[in-house]
Swiss-Prot record:
SUPFAM superfamilies assigned: NusB-like
The protein, known as: Transcription antitermination protein NusB
Signal sequence residues: none
UniProt family annotation: Belongs to the NusB family.
Gene for this chain: nusB
Amino acid sequence: MKPSFRRKARACALQVLYSWEISHNNIKESAIYFLKEKNKKNIDIVYFYELIIGITYDCKNIDNLMKPYLFRSLKELGHIERAILRISFYELHKRNDIPYKVSINEGIELAKLFGSEDSHKFINGVLDKAVFKMGYNKKVVIA
């Protein structure tokens, strides 16, 4: 099955967020540079920009949402795991139109693709705990 345009947007956002965190470059410039190298036809560009701008703008709040569900400090997390969790928590907190199961699954898939050998297990554990304790699993979305 081909990855969806939105999944590709998440994967691209992850790579730009990773680069931003390491280099401290301007996020918009990093995104423009990154997209020059990609086939943009297969990416949900609007969602890509929403993720990188939304996450960098609200990064401290997103990090504070994550902290209670981590068994180590944010600084101790790998850059990839931290970026994946930021994407997932952004979706859980800001995008009520995306089912929580989709956000969890997408985080796991990103971890399998970009993370270390057991990253997907760690991401799954953190997101499962957060969804349960924050009550996202009880949220009803009316479209």
